[in-house]
Amino acid sequence: MCGIVGYTGERDAAPIIVDSLVRLEYRGYDSAGVATIHEGRLYLEKDAGKLTEGGEPTKLQRSLRKLPGKIGIGHTRWATHGDPNRRNAHPHTDCRDEIAVVHNGIIENFMQLREELEDKGHRFDSETDTEVVPHLIEQGMKEGKSFFEAFVEAVRRLEGSYAIAAICTREPDVILAARKESPLVVGLGDDGNFLASDIPAILPETNRVIPIDDGEIVVVKRDEVRILDAETLEDVTEEKEVQIVEEDPHTLERRGYPHFMLKEIHEQPEAVRNTLRIERENLMEMAEELVGGDYTKLYIVACGTSYHAGLGAKYATELLAKFPVDVVIASEFRYVTKELVDENTLVLAISQSGETADTLAAVREANARGATTIALTNVVGSTITREVDHVMYTHAGFEKAVAATKTYTAQLAAMYTLAVELARHFGEITNKEAEEYHAELNKVPEMLEEVLSWEREREIAVMGGRYKERPNWFFIGRGPGYPTAMEGALKLKEITYQHAEAYPAGELKHGPLALIEEGVPVVAVAQPGGVYEKMLANIEEVKARGATVITVADEKDEAVEEHSDHVIRVPSISEVFSPIVYTVPLQLLAYYMSVARGIDPDYPRNLAKSVTVE
C-alpha cells in the first residue's frame, strides 16, 4: 500500500525519485519522504501530506526536489504503526544519521527487536516498526560488519512482510534492498538504475525491469545490479529474466480528462476489445487442458471489485458449462474453504495488481494442498503470475484511479471467454453456439461505446448532481444483476463517501425493506431474462414505499418506465453477459456524484489501489 523508489546514477536523484513517487500516488499514502547522499552526508526531508494537490506540486514536493546527490531512496507511507505525521514518515535513520531505510509491509517482531536495541543504547524517534531496521544495521556495523553484511544480518532477523531499501554514507554508491511478500522491481536504465514497488513508477525512465522474488537481496549501483539469495548469498543475477514492458508511458497521463477515473471508464471499449483479441487463443487452450483434468470444483478467490467480477464469472460458468463454482473472499479462503481443497480442485485467483496480499496467501494455501491454480491479472510479471500453474491477462493498460473500472470489465471479458470454451469442451453447447456467444462478446466494445456516448453520459451526470446529498443508497438485482448491484454500491461508497448497500432483490422482504422510505434512492438492475418479471415486482415494491428508483434497463424495455423515476438505457445483451454492460452506467453515476460532492474520485480517503498487506 506504500510506495518505494530508489535511484543511483549520473543525474540528480531527488527529482527522479519524487516524480516516481507521484506516479505511485494511486497506491494511497498519507506522508512522503526522500533521503539522498551527497559528499558523504545524508540529506533527508519528509512530512505528512500529499505531493500534489489538484495536479499541482505541494510545498512538500518542492522541498523534496531540492535534496542534493546522485543516489537516494524515497517513500510514500500509508500508516500501519503510528499516526501519519513527520516523525513516523519514512525514510527512517539510525542514531548517527548515516543510514536511511524505507520499508513497505509489516515487521511482526519489531517490539522485541526494539527492546533489544534500546537495551544496547539505541534511541528511537518514531512509533513505527520500520525504525528498527536502520538501528539493526547500525548495530551490525558497530560490531565490525560492512554495510552489506549488517544489512543481510538485519533482514534475516525480520519476521513478517517487507520490501526494504537502504543507503549508507559509508558506502555512498550502493542501494541495498530485500523482499519478502511485498512487491519490488529493479529497473535498468542507460544512465543509472532504479528500484520501485511498482513498474509504473519508473516506466518513463526505463522499460527494462527485473521482478524481485521473495527471499532475494538486491545490490544496486549506477552501472551494476546484483541479485542474491538471502539465505545462501548465492548470486542468482544470471537466472533472472529482464522483462521488456510494452506499455506506453502516456497511459499514465490524464490526456485531457479531468480525472484518471473518467479516462479509464472511457478506455473500457478498448480494454475489452484488446482482452478478447489477444487472450482468446490462450483461453481456448487453457479450457481444453482444464476439461481434460479430473476436476470436481472451482473456487474463485478475490477481493473487492475483483470479487464481484468473480461472481459474474460464476453465473456464466454455471449457466453455460454446468460446472460448480464457489466465489470466496480471499481473506476468508484460508480459514475454512482451504480444508476442502485438494488435487481435484481448480482455484482461480483474480488480482488486478497481481500483488494483493490476501489473494496471494490464498494461492499459496491452494498450491500447498495440491490444487491447480490460475491467475487473472492486469500486470505482466507480477508476483501472482510466478506462483500459479496458468495465467490469464487482462489487456487493459495501467489503471491509476483507486476505484477499478476498465480492469473489471476486462476481467469479465476474459472469464466469459473461458466459460464459453469450458462449455464447448464439456459438450454443454455446440460449436455453433460457442461461436455465437463469442460473436456477441466481440460486439461488447461497441455496446460500451454506446453507453459512453455524450447524450447518455450527460443524463447520468445530471442525475449524480441531483442526488449528491442523499445519504443512504440501495442497489438491487437478481441473477447476474446482483453482482452488478454489488459493484455499483461499492463504487458509490468508495468515491462519494455515501452509505450504499447491495442486496439480492429477493431479499428485500427479509429485512432491507424496513429501511425504504420516502426519497431513499434505490438503483435497480433489470436485465431481460429469466428473473425479469420478479425484478419488476421488486421495483414496484420499493416504489410503493416512496423510494426514488433509478433503473438500468434494456433499451427496448417499455414496461420499466412507469415504475421508475429514471431509466438508464443500455444496448441489448444476453442475460449471462449483462454485467459487462450494465455496470458501466453505475461507474459513471458514482463518478459524477463524487465530483459534484467535491471529492477527488482518483484518490478516495483511506483506500489504496494495491493492498499489499493483510
UniProtKB/Swiss-Prot annotation:
Active site: residue positions: 2 (nucleophile), 609 (for fru-6p isomerization activity)
Pfam families cross-referenced by the UniProt entry: GATase_6 (PF13522), SIS (PF01380)
Main location: cytoplasm
Record bears the keyword Cytoplasm: yes
Boundaries of every Glutamine amidotransferase type-2 domain copy: 2-223
Listed EC numbers: 2.6.1.16
Subcellular location: Cytoplasm
Domain SIS: 286-428, 463-604
Matches recorded under InterPro entries: GATase_2_dom (IPR017932), GFAT (IPR005855), GFAT_N (IPR047084), GlmS/AgaS_SIS (IPR035466), GlmS/FrlB_SIS (IPR035490), Ntn_hydrolases_N (IPR029055), SIS_dom (IPR001347), SIS_dom_sf (IPR046348)
Record function comment: Catalyzes the first step in hexosamine metabolism, converting fructose-6P into glucosamine-6P using glutamine as a nitrogen source.
Quaternary data: Homodimer.
Classification via NCBIfam families: glmS (TIGR01135), PRK00331.1 (NF001484)
Protein name: Glutamine--fructose-6-phosphate aminotransferase [isomerizing]
Gene source species: Methanopyrus kandleri (strain AV19 / DSM 6324 / JCM 9639 / NBRC 100938)
Organism classification: Archaea, Methanobacteriati, Methanobacteriota, Methanomada group, Methanopyri
